């Protein structure tokens, strides 16, 4: 009886792993936009942190220091949005597991 239960658990774990892999592949294609300076700088990136496009309003081109800050802020905004989306998508797979707070998957 124990052997059958263990086999069932292993099968469930394998199915969860396959589903997580599919979800990660899908998330790698999902795009999120980070914005800073009331839209003066926009960054489009995937949830896999691949930057696809950066849009900069011409009005901020003359102030290098401000532009650098806005680019960093827009990138950070996009990363946060991507991580939140990924967390929501992956939470369905980990809802039954007792993982410590802040634990990130995949390992």
Swiss-Prot record:
Keywords, comma-separated and alphabetical: Cytoplasm, DNA-binding
Any one Gene Ontology cellular component term annotated for this protein: cytosol
Family: Belongs to the YbaB/EbfC family.
Family annotation (InterPro entries): YbaB-like_sf (IPR036894), YbaB/EbfC (IPR004401)
Native source species: Dechloromonas aromatica (strain RCB)
Protein name stated in the entry: Nucleoid-associated protein Daro_0807
Record text on subunit structure and interactions: Homodimer.
KW Cell membrane (keyword) present: no
One Pfam family in the UniProt entry: YbaB_DNA_bd
Acetylation is among the record's keywords: no
One example GO MF annotation: DNA binding
Source taxon at top rank: Bacteria
Subcellular location: Cytoplasm, Nucleoid
Role: Binds to DNA and alters its conformation. May be involved in regulation of gene expression, nucleoid organization and DNA protection.
């Amino acid at each position: 009886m124990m052997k059958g239960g263990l086999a069932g658990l292993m099968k469930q774990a394998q199915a969860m792993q396959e589903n997580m892999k599919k979800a990660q592949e899908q998330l790698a294609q999902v795009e999120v936009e980070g914005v800073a300076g009331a839209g003066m700088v926009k960054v489009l990136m995937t949830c896999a942190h691949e930057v696809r496009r950066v849009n900069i309003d011409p009005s901020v081109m003359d102030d290098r220091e401000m532009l650098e800050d806005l680019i960093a802020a827009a990138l950070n905004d996009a990363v946060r949005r991507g991580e939140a989306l990924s967390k929501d998508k992956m939470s369905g797979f980990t809802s039954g597991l007792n993982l410590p707070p802040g634990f990130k998957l995949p390992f």
